[in-house]
């Protein structure tokens, strides 16, 4: 039953009439806010019109990057006009994330997504030490701008297990550091499940990227794992992921990171997120 619709059944109680039909709330209704990556919007409109499109599709916010070429002024204007929040900036693997931190503060965001890249010419230990130094250097500016730096689990990182990523975050010893947990990346290049990553990262998780490469419509079935068993026709066992997120009382932003498109496509992504996140 679609929890976003009124129940159609009522119970007559004597002459008092029919009971009002309540709206069913999902497990994470009111706890997770829906977002997507700005690059997923594939329509030529003004920024305000694009944000209006997101609002109609039932999104609450969006993430941008320096590569999008958006000025802080136009972003703020679009947010004021639509109430679509720009909650974060995607930086990636570059060593200097100061510009991303500044942009995040200027648009009213709270986090910058950072990757700890694997350099082929370095050993695991040297990659670990190098990335720790890079992120540590960025912490003072992040703290000054009231922005958190979130490490994401990606294919190009040397952090190949949830345990390694948790240790990396813990060694930074800063409340400005957290985890950006990507549900799909856990399966694509590791032998661990999405729920295992969620369990190990636990309280470190600040935001979540929603992705399932094995899904027929919102993924790429050609990339589907032969061993991963999902609950939505793909690879991610969403019920187990939700269980782990609930165990740490997760609340915050979840961003779709799948193939984008026009208004109809983005509306479909939004509805899919409702389903897998139980919103």
Give a label for each model feature.
Residues 71-89, 147:
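Short acidic, glycine/proline-enriched helix-loop-strand junctions
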Residues 50-69:
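Catalytic domains of carbohydrate-active enzymes, especially glycoside hydrolases
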Residues 72-78, 96-106, 193-203:
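Short amphipathic alpha-helices and their capping/turn segments at secondary-structure boundaries
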Residues 59, 84, 109, 147, ...:
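Short glycine/serine/threonine/alanine-rich loop segments
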Residues 2-35, 40, 44-56, 108, ...:
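Histidine-acidic metal/acid-base catalytic patches
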Residues 10-19, 28, 68, 88-181, ...:
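Active-site acidic/histidine proton-transfer and metal-coordination neighborhood
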Residues 63, 88, 113, 206-209, ...:
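Conserved beta-strand positions in the central sheet of alpha/beta enzyme cores
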């Amino acid at each position: 039953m679609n929890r976003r619709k009124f129940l159609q059944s009522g119970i007559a109680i004597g002459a008092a009439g029919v009971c009002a039909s309540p709206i069913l709330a999902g497990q994470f209704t009111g706890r997770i806010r829906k977002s997507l990556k700005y690059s997923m919007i594939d329509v030529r409109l003004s920024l305000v019109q694009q944000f209006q499109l997101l609002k109609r599709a039932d999104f609450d916010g969006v993430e941008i990057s320096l590569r999008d070429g958006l000025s802080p002024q136009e972003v703020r204007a679009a947010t004021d006009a639509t109430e679509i929040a720009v909650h974060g900036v995607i930086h990636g693997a570059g060593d200097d994330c100061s510009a991303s931190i500044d942009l995040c503060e200027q648009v009213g965001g709270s986090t910058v997504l950072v990757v700890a890249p694997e350099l082929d010419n370095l050993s695991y230990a040297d990659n670990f030490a190098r990335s720790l130094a890079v992120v540590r250097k960025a912490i003072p500016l992040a703290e000054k701008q009231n922005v958190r730096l979130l490490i994401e689990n990606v294919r190009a990182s040397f952090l190949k297990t949830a345990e390694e990523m948790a240790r990396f975050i813990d060694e930074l010893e800063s409340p400005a550091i957290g985890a950006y947990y990507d549900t799909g990346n856990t399966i694509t290049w590791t032998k661990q499940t999405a729920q295992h990553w969620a369990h190990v990262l636990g309280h470190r998780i600040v935001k979540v990227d929603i992705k399932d490469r094995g899904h027929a419509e919102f993924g790429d079935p050609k990339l589907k794992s032969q061993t991963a068993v999902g609950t939505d026709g793909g690879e991610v066992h969403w019920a187990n992921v939700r269980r782990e997120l609930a165990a740490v009382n997760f609340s915050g932003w979840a961003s779709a990171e799948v193939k984008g498109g026009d208004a109809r496509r983005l509306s479909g992504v939004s509805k899919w997120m409702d389903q897998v996140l139980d919103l």
